[in-house]
Amino acid sequence: MVELLRKDQKVENTWDLESIFKTNEDFWKQFKEVEKLIPEIQSYKGKVKEGAKALLEVFKAEEDMMLKVEQLTIYAYLRKDQDSTDAEYGEIYAKTMNLSSKFYSEWSFLKPELLSIEEDVLLGYADELDELKIYKFELEKLNKKRQHTLGSEQEKIIAMAGEALKASDETFAALNNADVEFEKVEDKEGNKHTLTHGTYGTYMESTDRVLRKNTFHSLYNYFKKHNNTLASTLGGNLKRKKYYADVYKYSSTRNNALSNNLIPEEVYDNLVAVVNKKIPALQRYYELHKRAKGLEDFRLYDRAVSMVKGDPIKFTFEEARDIVLEAVKPMGEEYVNDMRKAFTERWIDIYPNKGKRSGAYSWGGYTTKPFILLNFDGTLNDVYTLIHELGHSMHSYYTRKNQPYVYGSYSIFVAEVASTCNEALLTEYLYNKFEKEGNKNGMLRVLNQALSGFVGTVYRQTQFAEFEHTINQHLQNGGALTADYLNTEYFNLIKKYYGDVFTYDEDIKYEWSRVPHFYYNYYVYQYATGYSAAQALSKLILGDSKNAKVYIDEFLSKGNSNYPIEVLKNAGVDMSKPDSIELALQDFEEKIEKFEKL
């Protein structure tokens, strides 16, 4: 297939980046304005101590500049992603990243200065002026960090050590990306294929079992070869995070990670405990896989192949658009009409072209459209991707429509809720549609999509979360993070989750060493909690149309104006209790039963 060039894309199929800057000349004009503003930032140093009016002046100046930088950044990033072969946009991106880095570095004095003001005085400022009242919650959040903030000289020393402390992460990135080279893999015909991180998923979904087996072993042979080095890099990363937790007076690495958004630690523990109770449901799902594929010797490299035989369903983009607009009708007329803007106002860059970034995402700023990058190819998965990214964009749209800039985004803890809630609505709509049509293949494919999505997001991410917490606790208790320890812990966890459904290849014990999320800080659990919250919210919306209005007003529109756990609670889901996770797992079991009956 000949790859389309960017210049050959029809305008109506591309995103409207001209709504940010009509021309590159307009971009460079604003770029130069910001360059001139950066030296002025130092004039605001020390000002916040002068009183409420001065504080408001500093906040307004910072916001005005940030909006300009945000516009530049989004334009540069999206232009680069639409065609990485365009040298002009490569230059725009590189220069913008440099400018953005300088800008944020220059404003780094602000938070320490705010925390140098006594708590009652600082919060008193917010009551003095009406225009400052909107910042009160932000100042209250900042105040909670006082006991975890050091003096300016200590902070400076820690900041200076930051780059050196990241050496383990950089070594992992080099081994996992820049220096990675896998052995070529043979298919059943003896043809050799180049294996990369990008092609791994495609080969593992192949119906050619020889190719899958060789792909699996080629990948893990590489990580086996670097086992001790990767144990050292992960160990170094965990030690760095423990160091920061100790220095900033947190009780543990997890306590540090979750405290930023006041997420109770029992949210994490509830997730692991409830999912552990329902491990038999995961094993039942894989037994279903095993039977559907007719394999006695069922291996981990057989997991990704679809359980549904026959030709896949294909969709045009216009059909996908109509389907998603129908699927979200339970959300009410306002939501449907607002989502329609994504198609009429060119939020979406639809089709692949040479040099375009792979995958999909939603991104935009406070003053821009909530843009969506797709690489639409007409599969059922592409329809799910469309409604997923629209969920993110609608969350951003309502947040920015209803919140001031200071609260105009939302935390990672809730980031996947709106997108996954939309997916649940799509599953409900498509299943019912295919059932009415008597389309058994369609019903099976929708259930297969929902089940595999659940396993990948709830079970797999909880398994990762359990491993992450186990090894952090081991380090906290003075244990050594050796390759043998990490391999054994991970392999035991794999066997616990998958039971005796599979015949195990020991290579899987090296899987921990290729997961970049373990280098983040207690991040993966949020995929599973977000998915569970979304399932619970979709049930509320489908059960009573009044709940859709509550969801829009109390969740989608709230941004960062409250703690994420409270935002979800006000929308009808209390993540401090295990109920929503239990409900999601119950729904998973019901879908397995439906699949078995079909």
Task: Label the model's feature ranges.
Residues 313-315, 348-368:
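Catalytic zinc-binding patch centered on the HExxH motif and its immediate surroundings
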Residues 326, 330-337, 363, 392, ...:
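Conserved helix-loop functional segments at active or binding sites
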Residues 384, 396-420:
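Post-HEXXH active-site segment of zinc metalloproteases
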Residues 292-330, 336, 344, 395, ...:
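Long, K/E/R/D-enriched contiguous segments that form extended
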Residues 8-9, 22, 110, 114-117, ...:
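C-terminal, non-catalytic "cap/extension" segments appended to globular domains
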Residues 312-317, 367-387:
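Short pre-active-site segment immediately N-terminal to the catalytic Zn-binding motif
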Residues 1-310, 597:
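A well-structured
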